[in-house]
C-alpha cells in the first residue's frame, strides 16, 4: 500500500477490524518512512452474474433497474428505504450464491416477488400483475387467493 502523504511503498498495518456487518475490513496503517497514519477500507469485489433476457439477449446485472422495479411496485406504500435496500441486497446475495455466470431474468423476477411478498402484499400483487402479464380480473383473484392461504 502506497503512503498517500509521501508515496512510499512500505506501510505497516497497526489495527484491523471488520465493519459494515463484516463486509468490509477497516485497516489503520502507518508509513514506515514519514510515520503518517491513514485508514483504508477493503471489501471483496463480488461479480454479479449476467442476466439472460426472455428474448435470449444477455446484459450485465443492473442494480438500478432492480431497485427501480421494486420502488415502482412499492410506490405510495408504507415501506422504508432501509427495508427496500435490505431486499435489494438480499436479492443480489442470492444471485451471487447461485455461483452461475449467467442467470435467467425469470430467476431475478421470482426473487423480486419473494422479497415483495414479505415486504408488502399490495406491492407483490402489483409486481406480479405486470411480471406475469395478468389478462383479466380472474388472474388477480387467483393470485390474491394464494396470498390468503
Curated annotation (Swiss-Prot):
Belongs to the NrdR family. GO terms for biological process: negative regulation of DNA-templated transcription. Negatively regulates transcription of bacterial ribonucleotide reductase nrd genes and operons by binding to NrdR-boxes. InterPro entries: ATP-cone_dom (IPR005144), NrdR-like_N (IPR055173), RNR_NrdR-like (IPR003796). This is Transcriptional repressor NrdR. The lineage of its organism: Bacteria, Pseudomonadati, Pseudomonadota, Gammaproteobacteria, Aeromonadales. Keywords: ATP-binding, DNA-binding, Metal-binding, Nucleotide-binding, Repressor, Transcription, Transcription regulation, Zinc, Zinc-finger. Its cofactor is Zn(2+). GO terms for molecular function: ATP binding; DNA binding; zinc ion binding. It comes from Aeromonas hydrophila subsp. hydrophila (strain ATCC 7966 / DSM 30187 / BCRC 13018 / CCUG 14551 / JCM 1027 / KCTC 2358 / NCIMB 9240 / NCTC 8049). A zinc finger (unnamed) spans 3-34. It comes from the Bacteria. Binds 1 zinc ion. Residues 49-139 form the ATP-cone domain. PANTHER family: TRANSCRIPTIONAL REPRESSOR NRDR.
Amino acid at each position: 500500500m502506497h503512503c498517500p502523504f509521501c508515496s512510499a511503498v512500505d506501510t505497516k498495518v497497526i489495527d484491523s477490524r471488520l465493519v459494515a456487518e463484516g463486509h468490509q475490513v477497516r485497516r489503520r496503517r502507518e508509513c514506515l518512512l514519514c510515520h503518517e497514519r491513514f485508514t483504508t477500507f477493503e471489501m471483496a469485489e463480488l461479480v454479479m452474474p449476467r442476466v439472460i433476457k426472455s428474448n435470449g439477449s444477455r446484459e450485465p446485472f443492473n442494480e438500478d433497474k432492480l431497485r427501480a422495479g421494486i420502488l415502482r411496485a412499492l410506490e405510495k406504500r408504507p415501506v422504508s428505504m432501509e427495508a427496500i435496500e435490505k431486499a435489494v441486497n438480499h436479492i443480489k446475495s442470492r444471485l451471487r450464491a447461485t455461483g452461475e455466470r449467467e442467470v435467467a431474468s425469470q430467476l431475478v423476477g421470482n426473487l423480486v416477488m419473494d422479497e415483495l411478498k414479505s415486504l408488502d402484499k399490495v406491492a407483490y400483487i402489483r409486481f406480479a400483475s405486470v411480471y406475469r402479464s395478468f389478462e383479466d380480473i380472474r388472474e388477480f383473484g387467483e393470485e390474491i387467493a394464494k396470498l390468503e392461504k
